């Protein structure tokens, strides 16, 4: 039995992604019986095709090279095992359930805030991905220039984000935006999986951050990942009750790296995995700086009625071990 799922990267607005339980970042998932199973590929390499239609200033060959660099960046994560294989150019369009993973341009003027989107065909008996397509919206202007091009979005940056979806990651909330005419502008992003793209001409999105690396390693981790990295588990509570949908951020006092997770149960439980050994400051904050629907289904029941709060102690994470029973207490606004 199969089903289709989708996730998107937007220019100034957001779209639904499905969350799997209890992990740093968010992982895409599907219901298997009464539980949510993380989406993942059963076998590598992921074999993909490129649609043979180019756009202004981007030939199919240039597009394929940029897509290949995006896959290579994910493959370069030392604590995760992924690989890909470009099979060839085809006339087939993305977003068609035909058993082939196709990446290409499509003109979608009706989606005037969607830069690109990823869809899946999933085996709902076990959560394995059978096919995943990515479309880039040719309504926008695109570039593959090494240093970016003014007034054009960078193919490689957007590809890195969408390939993260293709591999099973959802969105990260590690970023800051400001309201501008027509939507929000990204000021800073600490994850390639942040759901709003950098502005035209910007190529900062070509780089993975600690949160992305922790996420992909959680899904496809190497033995070294389990051996060398630790986790923090606990709850976010308000007046003694769990807070659902809180964003919990771990800040490494030595490294300065940020890895984050969410409370995904009524009990307010969270787990942040993929942490280097060391000490961390923990912060819980509401998802009130954007569209909640870019992270959770509309009926998930996210609580945003609380103030930012910090755990009252620095947390020491051992190499290959975990810290449990952390409680971050928040108060209503």
Residue ranges and their predicted role:
Residues 1-10:
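Bacterial N-terminal signal peptides that target proteins for export
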Residues 20-333:
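Zinc-dependent metalloendopeptidases
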Residues 10-17:
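Bacterial N-terminal signal peptides
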């Amino acid at each position: 039995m199969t089903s289709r799922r989708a996730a998107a990267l937007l220019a100034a607005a957001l779209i639904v992604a499905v969350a799997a339980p209890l992990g740093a970042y968010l992982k895409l998932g599907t219901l298997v019986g009464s539980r949510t199973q993380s989406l993942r590929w059963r076998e590598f390499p992921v074999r993909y095709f490129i649609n043979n239609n180019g756009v202004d200033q981007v030939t199919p060959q240039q597009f394929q090279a940029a897509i290949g660099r995006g896959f290579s960046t994910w493959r370069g994560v030392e604590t995760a095992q992924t690989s890909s294989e470009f099979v060839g150019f085809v006339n087939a369009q993305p977003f068609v359930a035909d058993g082939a993973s196709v990446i290409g341009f499509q003109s979608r003027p009706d989606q005037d805030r969607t830069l690109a989107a990823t869809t899946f065909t999933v085996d709902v008996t076990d959560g394995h991905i059978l096919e995943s397509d990515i479309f880039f919206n040719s309504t926008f202007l695109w570039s593959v220039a090494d240093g970016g091009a003014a007034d054009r979005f960078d193919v490689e940056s957007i590809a890195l984000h969408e390939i993260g979806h293709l591999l099973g990651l959802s969105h990260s909330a590690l970023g800051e935006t400001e309201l501008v005419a027509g939507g929000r502008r990204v000021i800073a992003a600490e994850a390639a999986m942040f759901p709003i793209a950098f502005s035209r001409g910007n190529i900062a999105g070509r780089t993975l951050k600690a949160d992305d690396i922790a996420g992909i390693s959680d899904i496809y981790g190497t033995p070294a990942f389990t051996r060398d990295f630790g986790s923090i588990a606990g709850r976010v509570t308000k007046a003694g009750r769990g807070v659902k949908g809180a964003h919990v951020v771990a800040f490494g006092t030595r490294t300065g790296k940020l890895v984050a997770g969410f409370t995904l149960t009524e009990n307010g439980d969270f787990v942040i995995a993929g942490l280097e050994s060391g000490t961390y400051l923990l912060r819980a904050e509401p998802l009130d700086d954007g569209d909640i629907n870019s992270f959770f289904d509309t009926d998930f029941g996210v609580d945003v009625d609380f103030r930012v709060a910090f755990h009252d102690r620095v947390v020491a994470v051992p190499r290959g071990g975990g810290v449990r029973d952390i409680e971050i207490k928040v108060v209503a606004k």
